[in-house]
C-alpha cells in the first residue's frame, strides 16, 4: 500500500476507533456490517458488535461513520488531492 494511502486511512480509522464512532462497513460484495472499530492494521479491521469480526481491508468498499468526524492527521504538510 502506498504511503499516501496510509496517510489518509490510518488517521481516519484511528479517529473512529478512539471516539468509538459507530460505523457501517460495506463490503465489495454488497454486504453491510455495522459496529465500532476496535483495532486495525495494514491488512485487517476488527469490527465489534455483539461479537468481534476480523474484516480484511481488500474486501471493504466503503466505511461510513454514523456521525461527522474530524480527522486528526499527524503530518499536515500534504494537502487534499
UniProtKB/Swiss-Prot annotation:
Keywords: RNA-binding, Stress response. Coiled coil: none annotated. Pfam families: Hfq (PF17209). GO terms for biological process: regulation of DNA-templated transcription; regulation of RNA stability; regulation of translation, ncRNA-mediated. GO terms for cellular component: cytosol. Residues 10-69 form the Sm domain. One of its GO terms (molecular function) is RNA binding. Belongs to the Hfq family. PANTHER family: RNA-BINDING PROTEIN HFQ (PTHR34772:SF1). Homohexamer. RNA chaperone that binds small regulatory RNA (sRNAs) and mRNAs to facilitate mRNA translational regulation in response to envelope stress, environmental stress and changes in metabolite concentrations. Also binds with high specificity to tRNAs. This is RNA-binding protein Hfq. The gene is hfq.
